Amino acid sequence: MDNPVTNAAVSTVADAATNAGTVFNGLDWFVIALFGLGMIATVWYSMRKKNESGKDYFLSGRDANWLQIGSSIYSSNIGSEHLVGLAGAGFVTGMAMAHWEMHGWLILVLGWAFVPLYDRMKIFTMPEFLELRFSRGSRNVLSLLTMASLVLTKIAATIYAGDVVIRTLLNVDSVNLLGHNVDIFWVIALGLAFTTGLYTIFGGMRVIMYTAVLQAPVLIFGSVCILYMGLHVLGHGSLADGWKATLSAAGKNVHLVRSIHDPDWPWLAILPGSAIIGFWYWCTDQYIVQRVLAGKNQQESRRGTILAAFFKLTPVFIFLVPGMVAFALTQTPGSGFTTGGDAAYTSLVAQGDAAYTSLVAQILPHGLRGMVACGMIVALMASLGSKFNASATLFTMDFYREWHPTASGRTEVIVGRIATAAIVFIGICWVLVIKSLHMPLYEYLQNVQGYLSPAIAVLFALGVFWKRATAPAALWAFVVGMLGGFGRLAADLIIARPINTLKGITDGNLSMLNYLVKGSVNVAAEKTQQIKDQIQEATSQMASALPLVKDQLAIKIQCLQQILGGTGITPDQYNEKKTIVEAALPALKTQLHEQWGLIFSFQQNIHWLYYCEGLLVVTAALMIIISLLTRAPDPKTVKYTYYGATPEEKAATRASWNAMDVVLSLIVVAVIVLFYIKFW
């Protein structure tokens, strides 16, 4: 029997896919306006208290409660990697990326093991811990690296995600400003950065905390609606049938743990590797831990982490699974669902990037579309504002206060606002730079945190839990770990980018080549020029990065350039030229291996998560050996370890938790274990 609700939903999918004007209607815009007024009221309310000192501006006066802390951790975490990346990962690889989302137990480690220490120290920044435990030098290095990572990768990534989200929701590529067609990217980038920067500059951490309480429930509720409607449509009115269809479409991708021989997600790489990065992110990264430092006391901070751990259980179900549902819908004949163009001529990754917002635009009824769109946009703003504030905190507290130790609290606030404004400006300028670069370069820059996290994780783990760790050992281990991370990053940039650029041109799933076989001469001519530009860029990279093999590569590159024959090609010509290119690539890789040897082997054959694990082992071993060979640390620094609390401090920590806190924490762990058992 036909289900009228399902029929209406399917009709909505088909209509939205063919008619851009139906994405939003008056009800959606009313909801968006209403939510906007709510945000303005929340910002105004949070700014009633004046920021009189650095503690007020950067840590919300250290009076945040558990609801604000937990909501802020969650809202700050839900950024580009979730709204675009996680749903896209679900679309392309199924459950493979769920490991990172099942790290609620690491948030509990933050609350139970690190909160007592951080609370005793009353620090403003994570690098400040390194100075008190080890040396000023280690503080400076970590602070600079963290600021660079925030500004050059995370801020820009959030702005890029905003472009994908808003562009898909509005179905607009350009707008007319003063008689000129302007790419919508610039309107979105400048609008997000300016609006978020404005309230962050004047409100500081307090406004971020207050708005998070409004943002988190709206985003979760709206995302649950997306999951419900997606399964409902896919199952023709039955959620159970929709879930079965999702699992069926995913096939082997439904499993969390893949074979050790899997080229992308071998279990021995992803299980320990994701935990290493997770420990760094949840327990030591300024961007996240700053919310805990703002807590009123240990009890509020710990309970905030417990709430955040519960929240962290949701992204798999409200972001990753909807991506899997979107994939199943694209495989269902007659569904009318599309993720950014003709699936036959659009890469799977590009379709995945638009999966979540396509569900919003095509599955949800009007009204809910507007509400979920608000939740998505303010989640990006919350993530962006947190990054602005964290960067300004690092500059002001780790550098300015060191240069001007007698500066008043009011001066710290002024400097913090100026620093925030400067970071907003630098972030916009950097977006202008990366917009002109080939995307693979930016994607490799995103790996910075993966390659640098092992050294930071070692410093904090041994610094907190091992009394014998010394300052010289920490500095040497940090330097070696950083060099190892940057070395792998350099190998990626020097070797992989040119190879992958050229190889990507031959990928039959990528839209560039597939457009050539669509039969449109005009489109083919345009795409041919884009491919020509790509190959010329890759050729230039090869020549500059590999001067020793320039002559040897000339023949291979010439073969690759044969693909540029004419303004349009037939499918047979396409296949012929594709065969030529694919035949040239093995010889190209062989030549590179002969010239670059070990570096090329490392880049090509060692999974980046294996490299992360190996770097952790090397860094930890080095720090332990040097610590044992150098003078024992000053007893004054040992008090900044997990075991350095006085009897009074231990009693205060014990009084800050009760049986309910333990039970709730165990529930989080139990859910994670059951999830792994179910999807093993």
Model-derived features with residue positions:
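Membrane-embedded helix-loop-helix hairpins and adjacent transmembrane boundary segments
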Residues: 2-680
